[in-house]
């Protein structure tokens, strides 16, 4: 795992994907909600009084169309409903951008833990027009770019909510662009992301290799907490582990060796105890329970 772009503690790649899965489930729930909110119709006359159009006509027409009559309107259905729809699309697009940024980040040459599909039928087969060796994450970059457009459109939908009196048509010209464009763009990036995730290559060897890049520094918190359990003040334990970490990084010495030769740590942890602390499985002990809670196992 990484936080602030820096190695944090071990986790499984499956947990990362499960996090995305749960977020997508929330989007599906939101779509169901907004369908209910937005599936309304109205035929209520120039200012919403029904003076020239009886309510019964509105109810009959809406029923035929599978809509609910809006309880009250002026000349139009209020644009908070439209804005809500586009906000939900923007949320979906932004999640796909978030997932895509992660894929792009993990595809970088020096990380190379996953790769989006490349060279297969229906996928990109040219990374760079001038550098033949490149496999650029073009599909996920495209998702990120289009997501920005959908978010911008959702802001325009908010701008369409305040209108003069019982209606003006300043919203109309914008809606002719932002509503169809947002749905088309969302459909495109959803399908593109499905293609990416379905054909994505996972490089397990590089994941393990990168896990060991820091020479064991990823176990720092576990060692610190073990010292605290031995009665060392947390502040003192933190400073000792931080000092050992800096020495390991600056001198290129394996973190475990630095720990074993630190006087304060040696007083509290013997070599066998230190060895047992450098265990990646410790960090994964609740993974199965998390998946069960997500109903994925």
Where are these regions (language model features)?
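Glycine-rich cofactor/substrate-binding loops
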Residues: 129-297
């Amino acid at each position: 795992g990484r936080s602030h772009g820096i190695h944090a503690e071990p986790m499984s790649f499956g947990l990362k994907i499960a996090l995305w899965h749960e977020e997508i489930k929330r989007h599906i729930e939101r779509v169901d909600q907004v369908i209910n909110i937005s599936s309304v119709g109205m035929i209520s006359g120039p200012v919403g009084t029904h003076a020239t159009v009886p309510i019964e006509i509105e109810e009959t027409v809406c029923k035929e169309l599978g809509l609910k009559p809006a309880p009250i309107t002026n000349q139009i259905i209020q644009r908070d409903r439209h804005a809500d729809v586009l906000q939900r699309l923007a949320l979906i697009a932004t999640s796909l951008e978030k997932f895509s940024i992660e894929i792009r980040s993990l595809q970088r040459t020096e990380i190379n833990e996953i790769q989006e599909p490349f060279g297969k039928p229906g996928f990109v087969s040219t990374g760079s027009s001038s550098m033949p060796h490149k496999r650029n994450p073009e599909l996920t970059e495209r998702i990120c770019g289009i997501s920005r457009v959908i978010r911008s459109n959702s802001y325009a939908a908010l701008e369409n909510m305040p209108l003069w009196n019982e209606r003006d048509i300043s919203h109309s010209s914008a809606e002719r662009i932002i509503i169809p464009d947002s749905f088309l763009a969302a459909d495109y990036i959803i399908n593109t992301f499905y293609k990416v995730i379905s054909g994505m290559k996972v490089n397990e060897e590089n994941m393990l290799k990168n896990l060991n890049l820091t020479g064991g520094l990823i176990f720092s918190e576990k060692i610190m907490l073990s010292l605290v359990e031995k009665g060392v003040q947390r502040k003192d334990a933190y400073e000792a582990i931080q000092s050992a970490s800096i020495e390991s990084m600056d001198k290129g010495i394996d973190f475990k060796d630095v720990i074993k030769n630190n006087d304060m740590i040696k007083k509290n942890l013997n070599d066998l105890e230190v060895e047992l602390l450098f265990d990646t499985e410790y960090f994964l002990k609740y993974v199965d329970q998390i998946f069960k809670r997500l109903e994925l196992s």
